[in-house]
Design a protein with these regions (language model features):
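Mid-domain alpha/beta scaffold segments of enzyme catalytic cores
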Residues: 1-273
Length: 273
């Protein structure tokens, strides 16, 4: 089976067919999903989705786009909310210098607050880093000097240096459908180089659908295609990638539980032999 550790099931693209989205994921062999928070104040929405489906979990946190809106929420409130049994992660939080909907200062403050919450709870932090490799690395190094914390660089599109620094700090690196894009040659080289026991896969659905669905609404079932791209880059089988990334997920997301009924991975979904 595979895990999609980062999707946004509360987004309007899924409002009319969420049960169908979940069913298609299972049919493709995706047994566990994590719906990711972008606003702490929408906690009840994420919680409701997770509580309605046995194998869906959720996170608590503020996306860097929205950092300026929720700086009034203290770290201890994130810690308190994270105690829900199906809340398995903190975030997503981090730095986005591409859009900068929040100031860099607000993003950095929010990032550090979420790191503190991850450190206190032991839950992994879902890190968003776009066009901000240098500052992301600087904050990670600075914060690790104050105490280690579990984390993953989600939807990784950064450079080799950031990926290697993250792994050196004990973090994980996650690849999305971007990995399958024609121009992502350098990213595929990074996916081939990193230790397999530090790699995760995700969709970031409804965005960034992998080839051959690029330009369409992404959904968790399509994580199979990203996993196949990792396998191709490393010259190993999809089954090996699925096994490793699933084990990695449950090692990092310690509150998540493996599904009672493990769906069979549909290798043919990617055209693999």
């Amino acid at each position: 089976m595979l895990v999609d550790h980062h999707c946004h099931l509360d987004f309007p693209q899924f409002s009319e067919d969420l049960d169908g989205v979940v069913a298609r994921a299972r049919a493709a062999g995706v047994g566990t999903l994590v719906t990711i928070s972008t606003h702490i104040r929408r906690f009840d929405t994420y919680k409701a989705i997770a509580e309605a489906h046995e194998d869906i979990f959720f996170s608590v946190g503020t996306h860097p786009h929205n950092a300026h809106e929720e700086l009034d929420i203290p770290v201890q409130e994130i810690v308190r909310l994270s105690q829900h049994p199906k809340c398995v992660a903190v975030g997503e939080a981090g730095l986005d210098y591409f859009y900068q909907h929040s100031s860099r200062e607000a993003q950095a403050e929010g990032f550090r607050r979420h790191i503190q919450a991850a450190r206190e709870t032991g839950l992994p932090l879902e890190i968003h880093a776009r066009d901000a490799d240098e500052d992301t690395a600087a904050i990670l190094l600075d914060e690790h000097s104050a105490g280690a914390f579990p984390a993953v660089l989600h939807c990784f599109t950064g450079g080799r240096d950031l990926a290697l620094k993250a792994v050196d700090l004990g973090l994980y690196v996650s690849f999305s459908g971007v990995l399958s894009f024609k121009k992502a040659k350098e990213l595929r080289q990074i996916a081939a180089e990193l230790p397999l026991d530090r790699i995760l896969v995700e969709t970031d659905a409804p965005y960034l659908a992998p080839v051959p669905f690029r330009g369409k609404t992404n959904e968790p079932a399509y994580v199979v295609h990203t996993a196949q791209t990792v396998a191709d880059a490393r010259r190993i089988t999809l089954t090996e990638v699925a096994s490793a990334t699933t084990d990695n997920f449950f090692r990092l997301y310690k509150k998540a539980r493996r599904p009672t009924e493990v769906p069979e991975l549909v290798v043919s979904a990617t055209g693999a032999a």
